[in-house]
């Protein structure tokens, strides 16, 4: 089957810049990466095709040869792979490491020698109460992870023995294969990129150098965190291969809903009910805060929904910026379960507000009905 044009594979024009080529490669490599398409042979083939196109079009010599001769440029002098194995040559692993190293927890292997793979990063979802998030707290957590085997010190080899340098790649973890007059590096098929062969594996970890364990950690949560904040614990992720550095543990914070307060940034919000008599006549009402109850003076003739700001009663931000405020919304309650006498008093009150002077006791009603009147006047004019 004939190969597709490399420019077509990456979806770029022939005069595309190296930056455009790299951008297209990253997008397609992410899309077709085997770790994201496990078991999908079609995606694996497309990933190889994209990688091959990128390797050619970002190398000035290869690109010039391809632009002049097409795929035939890489089939000269033997037509395909040949020339045996070697340890040197150009390294095309750099861009692969740049794109996928952070996503899949991997390091990258350079042409100058093998570097063991860093351990994978882990994530732990932690749920906090609002009080814990605002004040800070230390939480004990248990994390299942991979740790270095203490029996072999992470080497994978039985105590008293050691791993041997791979004879195929001479410890590089990669081998060089020749395609036409170009050399391409690939993962060593003997040691699978590790650079070493373990002939006498450790009985504890079966040659892996790592074993499963549940770690207990005390995590200090700083005051002021909020949902979406992430705390990094360096080196508390999975242990790396063959003694390589461990990954990191990221604690993802989620703050549970509170039955009184809502949080927006460093400010807190709450609703406080008041009787219609207090709203009309004024008075004082107790308001809950995270530090205890405080009194709020309610002015006379307060309408429902009015907001009051209590400065410094909010949250101290984890990134600084001072302490937020508590915003109190007063909600005027309509009385229920009235006795006959209470109903009579309310009727008397309503009648006393009637007549031409009624609107002066109901400022919102006056504005509303004036607006309704104007609306219908406009319709009929």
UniProtKB/Swiss-Prot annotation:
The answer to whether the entry has keyword Membrane is no
Q: What is its main location?
A: cytoplasm
The answer to whether the entry has keyword Iron is no
Entries under PROSITE patterns matching the protein = DNAJ_1 (PS00636), DNAJ_2 (PS50076), ZF_CR (PS51188)
Q: How is the cofactor bound?
A: Binds 2 Zn(2+) ions per monomer.
**The J domain, residue ranges:** 5-70
Source superkingdom: Bacteria
Q: Which SUPFAM superfamilies match?
A: Chaperone J-domain (SSF46565), DnaJ/Hsp40 cysteine-rich domain (SSF57938), HSP40/DnaJ peptide-binding domain (SSF49493)
Per its UniProt record, the required cofactor names are: Zn(2+)
Which molecular function GO terms apply here?
ATP binding; heat shock protein binding; unfolded protein binding; zinc ion binding
GO CC, alphabetical = cytoplasm
Write out the entry's keywords from A to Z.
Chaperone, Cytoplasm, DNA replication, Metal-binding, Repeat, Stress response, Zinc, Zinc-finger
Assembly behavior = Homodimer.
Its UniProt domain note says: The J domain is necessary and sufficient to stimulate DnaK ATPase activity. Zinc center 1 plays an important role in the autonomous, DnaK-independent chaperone activity of DnaJ. Zinc center 2 is essential for interaction with DnaK and for DnaJ activity.
Q: Which PANTHER family did the record assign? A: CHAPERONE PROTEIN DNAJ (PTHR43096:SF48), DNAJ HOMOLOG 1, MITOCHONDRIAL-RELATED (PTHR43096)
| Identification of the protein by name | Chaperone protein DnaJ
Organism expressing this protein natively: Vibrio parahaemolyticus serotype O3:K6 (strain RIMD 2210633)
Its taxonomic path starts at: Bacteria, Pseudomonadati, Pseudomonadota, Gammaproteobacteria, Vibrionales
């Amino acid at each position: 089957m004939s190969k597709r044009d490399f420019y077509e594979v990456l979806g770029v024009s022939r005069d595309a810049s190296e930056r455009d080529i790299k951008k297209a490669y990253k997008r397609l490599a992410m899309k077709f990466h085997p770790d994201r398409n496990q078991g999908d042979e079609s995606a694996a083939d497309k990933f190889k095709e994209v990688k091959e196109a990128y390797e050619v079009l970002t190398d000035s010599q290869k690109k010039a040869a391809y632009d002049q001769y097409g795929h035939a440029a890489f089939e000269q002098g033997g037509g395909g792979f040949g020339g045996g194995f070697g340890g040197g040559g150009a390294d095309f692993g750099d861009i692969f490491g740049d794109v996928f190293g952070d996503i899949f927890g991997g390091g990258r292997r350079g042409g100058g020698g093998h570097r063991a793979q860093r351990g994978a990063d882990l994530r732990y979802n932690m749920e906090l109460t609002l009080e814990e998030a605002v004040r800070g707290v230390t939480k004990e957590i248990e994390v299942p992870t991979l740790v270095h085997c203490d029996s072999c010190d992470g080497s994978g080899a039985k105590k008293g023995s050691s791993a041997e340098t791979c004879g195929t790649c001479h410890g590089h973890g990669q081998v060089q294969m020749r395609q036409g007059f170009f050399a391409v590096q690939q993962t060593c098929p003997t040691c699978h990129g590790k650079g070493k062969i373990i002939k006498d594996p450790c009985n504890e970890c079966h040659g892996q150098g790592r074993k499963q364990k549940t770690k207990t950690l005390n995590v200090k949560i700083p005051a002021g965190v909020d949902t979406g904040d992430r705390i990094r614990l360096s080196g508390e992720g999975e242990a790396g291969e063959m003694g390589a550095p461990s990954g990191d543990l990221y604690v993802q914070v989620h703050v549970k809903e509170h039955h009184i307060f809502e949080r927006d940034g460093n400010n807190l919000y709450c609703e406080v009910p008041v009787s219609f008599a207090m709203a009309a006549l004024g008075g004082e009402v107790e308001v809950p805060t995270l530090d205890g109850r405080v009194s709020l003076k309610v002015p006379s003739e307060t309408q429902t929904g009015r907001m009051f700001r209590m400065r410094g009663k909010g949250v101290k931000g984890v990134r600084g910026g001072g302490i937020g405020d508590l915003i109190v919304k007063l909600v005027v309650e309509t009385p229920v379960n009235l006795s006959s006498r209470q109903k009579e008093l309310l009727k008397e009150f309503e009648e006393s507000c009637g007549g031409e002077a009624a609107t002066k006791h109901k400022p919102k009603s006056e504005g509303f009905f004036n607006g309704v009147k104007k609306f219908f006047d406009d319709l009929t004019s």
